[in-house]
Amino acid sequence: MKIMQAMAGAGFGGAEAFFVRLANAFQRVNSIEQKVIIRENPNRAALLRAGGVEPIEMKFGGRFDFATPRALKREINKFNPDVVLTWMNRATLMCPKGDFVHVARLGGYYDL
């Protein structure tokens, strides 16, 4: 199974810590091929690299960040994942539609 994860969290809270543990655990499973995209964060990148994951860092900026959605789409098209798992609202909103299952893990509480 090919899984792409995109984490747009800025800080390092509970969801971000779980994401790092999950990505590092997936890295040890032979039946999972994964690609990891993260918001620019040297600490998170170092923790992932320590687990054998080589993350791709993107800006995941605000509403005027037009580069990240294009770059994310390009990486998805190159990798051709079965599943895209997005973490946090920003990554979810920047994820294009495609021929994959999209699973969104949103953080915090939202007034829907």
Task: Give each language-model segment a name.
Residues 1-112:
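Membrane-interface segments of envelope glycosyltransferases acting on lipid-linked substrates or membrane lipids
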